[in-house]
Amino acid sequence: PDVSIIFVGDEERVRKELDVHDIKGLESRITCHHASQVVEMGENGLESVRKKKDSSISRAVDLVKDGEADAVVSAGHTGALVAAATIKLRTLPGIDRAGLGVLIPAEGGVFLLIDGGANIDPSPKHVVGFAVMGSVYYQSIVGGGEARVGLLNIGSEPGKGTEFCKECYALLLEAPIRFVGNIAGHGIFKKQAEVVVCDGFTGNIFLKTVEGFAKSVFSWLKVELNQSPLRMAGAWLARGAFRSIKNRTSTDEYGG
């Protein structure tokens, strides 16, 4: 594809890193944009955007704002990136808050969890915005027709959960989406919905719990398989399946 990349950051360090990689044939597609500041992971995202005007995250978003780039990809401070995008690019009409969408493997494909941590205390109206954005994103990127949207809750029955969840449920019923009701945690990976919405506090806990549990399962398997030569032989024969499952559950593939 005809894609160009602008690396934003300390130009000297970026170029040193590029020198140790084989970029032959890509030189014309790669440029550097110097940024003198960095948002550290322990900083407040919103404050960093206001105070560090020349941070790599702020400058990268500025490039999109000025029409010099079409998108930003970052492994940096999530809160700072969301804040910078919201302040500099604004949100879509009818959408008040940005939400973090994370594609997660499930039976028969993937589902989208939104919000994964951008808003820990949103209003029910914000959650409806997440549902609309998530539905459009899933249909556009993953495909497969109109996405089913479920509300993460402690049970599937209507009327379950906190007052916040009940308010979200009522508004989602009226939203221009295919809302299928509440979804309890044990039903998510059965892909009862293509899009699962929740507040960022709940979503982030869910993501990190799943990540930690997946790693623990592989640790337990390793201990059990090392109990006998016969088990180790069986594990060797099934190594391809283990590798495939490990890759599917890796946060390197799906985020977390």
Labelled PLM ranges:
Residues 2-6, 11-15, 120-185, 194:
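Glycine-rich phosphate/diphosphate-binding loop of Rossmann-like nucleotide-binding domains
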Residues 70, 76-126, 130:
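Glycine/threonine-rich beta-strand-loop-alpha-helix active-site module
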Residues 14-41, 95-98, 102-106:
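N-terminal short beta-loop-beta anion/metal-coordinating cradle
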